[in-house]
Amino acid sequence: MSREEAIASLKQMPENLRQQVAGLTDAQLHFQPEGGYFSVLENICHLRDIEIEGYGVRLHRVLAENHPALPDINGAQLARERHYSEQSLQPALDAFTRARHANLNILEGVTKTQLTWAAHLEGIGEITLGKLLELWAEHDRGHVQELEKLLAAVR
């Protein structure tokens, strides 16, 4: 995936999420599928926190530090600790959107040389900023697919 393709994909996510959750009832937002998967609301809260504390921090560190060690984030642990199921949708969605736009502003200024800058991502290993960008877009796609399955079950 090229830088341009990844950025285009990342740009679409806030609007994709807004469209996916538009008109959902409280029961639909909180529907908990079997297997320990996130509800729709928990997905949005997760995306918000990973955008801010995961990919946003990783982006800043790769650009500011020489070969940083980037920690993994335990999304399930965050969901429990932060009580995602008790949060409100709109503030979470708005915070995700603001963070995504801020990160995109930085990404759009990244040079080809900076895309080759390396880091060590816990659980993955050695990556470049370009690879991090791909992982970011893949993370979005995974949640879009998860939300599509959830929405099919609740509508």
Task: Describe the role of every protein-language-model region.
Residues 1-3, 7-10, 14, 82-89, ...:
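Small-residue-biased structural context
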Residues 16, 20-23, 27, 58, ...:
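Amphipathic, soluble alpha-helical interaction motifs
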